């Protein structure tokens, strides 16, 4: 078993600084947010897919701090009643899956949070 943290908890910090903090705290793996309600502070999958060097930079940072990727995640509501909002969530999810494939990550997490949208300040 490995201790993992959802990196969006440190979204205000640059990814390198967040990884350093987590490694010093004994964390061994990270779940990286890639869109949806928590945002894309450390990883915008569309941007990473368009610029593969960003993938290399992220993987190098993780290696530097001896961290693994537990999962990529995008917590959005792909069945949102507003079609434009739903489409953005779908795009984030699709790009996250494609990015996971490129990065060799075998776990992608998606959760709509439809029951508790107030936790992420979204207006349904």
Language-model features and meaning:
Residues 25-29, 104:
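Glycine-enriched alpha-helix->loop->beta-strand junction motifs that scaffold or abut catalytic
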Residues 33, 42-61:
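Glycine-rich, positively charged N-terminal anion/phosphate-binding segment
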Residues 38-41, 122-124:
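Short glycine/proline- and charge-enriched loop/turn segments
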Residues 16-17, 21, 56-57, 61-65, ...:
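Active-site acidic/histidine proton-transfer and metal-coordination neighborhood
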Residues 1-5:
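Extreme N-terminal starter segment of soluble prokaryotic enzymes
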Residues 11, 47, 51, 85-89:
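Residue-level preference for long, well-ordered alpha-helices that form the structural scaffold
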Residues 31, 71-73, 109:
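Conserved beta-strand positions in the central sheet of alpha/beta enzyme cores
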Residues 6-10, 33-37, 74-77, 113-115:
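Active-site beta-loop-alpha junctions enriched in small/polar residues
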